[in-house]
Amino acid sequence: MMARRDPKSWAKRLVRAQTLQKQRRAPVGPRAPPPDEEDPRLKCKNCGAFGHTARSTRCPMKCWKAALVPATLGKKEGKENLKPWKPRVEANPGPLNKDKGEKEERPRQQDPQRKALLHMFSGKPPEKPLPNGKGSTESSDHLRVASGPMPVHTTSKRPRVDPVLADRSAAEMSGRGSVLASLSPLRKASLSSSSSLGPKERQTGAAADIPQPAVRHQGREPLLVVKPTHSRPEGGCREVPQAASKTHGLLQAARPQAQDKRPAVTSQPCPPAATHSLGLGSNLSFGPGAKRPAQAPIQACLNFPKKPRLGPFQIPESAIQGGELGAPENLQPPPAATELGPSTSPQMGRRTPAQVPSVDRQPPHSTPCLPTAQACTMSHHSAASHDGAQPLRVLFRRLENGRWSSSLLAAPSFHSPEKPGAFLAQSPHVSEKSEAPCVRVPPSVLYEDLQVSSSSEDSDSDLE
């Protein structure tokens, strides 16, 4: 009988029995879902996703074929551009595009304003715009700037200048013009004086190392210029008065008449290098600068003795026989006038080229033997160009404060030579020992007196 039983049926019975036993042993509760279904309460430890465990075949860490890109839960149209490489072409443009097209078609409102502003800066009158407004856009197309701000509308009138400022500026311009006009004669005179040095520059040997100063010349009177040099020649001074008397006589014969009125030229304090022409009766006082000038020496034609000290200033009759000297404007004698009183030589003249080497072409001049003062007779032009004029004589005097003052002495030929007392009465400081022969002295006596240095007082004490 056992053989008659089918093994298949026996197996079926066994499976049923096992299933029944499992059903009995199962706890009472919710049934677990099948393995293919997702449970959102589960979380995979490998990938961190919900719906499966680490042992599930849905985990992408174990089965790469099942790893899919997570899709979005829901699509929302209009949030993102699925094809950004293709620009969106809209059949109906929006309101912004419509406004932009209208602005390009119609003329711009700010074009007339820009044109008016352009005409205001250029100075041209603005043109009247056409009624339709199309003519203004054609001429100002090059001025359009898409990103530029609109200009402020202004009128084409230029700003008016304040009358107070205009009057002040006019006054300043007139003041400058008067200053230039006052300086122009001096500049012209400097050119004329430099060009007139030709006739006399070859006749004289004594010259200075400084440039020719600007001289103002009026009329036919000879010009007086003081020429300082570095040193004095140490040759004898007895030969100079003889040549001076000859020159003085020739000048008197060539110029029989002299002008009574001579223009007075204002003089200002200046260094010895710059001197101006002097009129009759004018005084020139100048002081040395704070520093020693490099090329401002003092010209001394003769040797001056240091000792003995001369008395009051006097001019002998022999020095003014050529004519009566003009009355100069006397200076107040300083306390040291008795010790430093200058003296004049009886004869005036010029040096010959053999006595003094010519360094620079300058007008002729000569000075007598004076310890602290000198008289200089000079003429820039020839005798033919100054008929009726006499050479003038400049007298330099040293003051107490270290400055020098100069007075102008004239010697016209039409006066009688028997009246020298007129000048002597007006100038009481004339040396009585002016006819004394000159003595050789060091060439730096007058040069040191005209310089400002700490040893000026010591030199005065040594001379005393």
UniProtKB/Swiss-Prot annotation:
Q: Which residues form a coiled coil?
A: none
> Which InterPro entries does this one have?
FAM90, Znf-CCHC_6
Instruction: Determine the domain of life of the protein's source.
Output: Eukaryota
**Compositionally biased tracts (Basic and acidic residues):** 74-89, 97-114
Please name one Pfam family that this protein belongs to.
zf-CCHC_6
Family that this chain belongs to: Belongs to the FAM90 family.
Protein name as annotated: Protein FAM90A16
Native source species: Homo sapiens
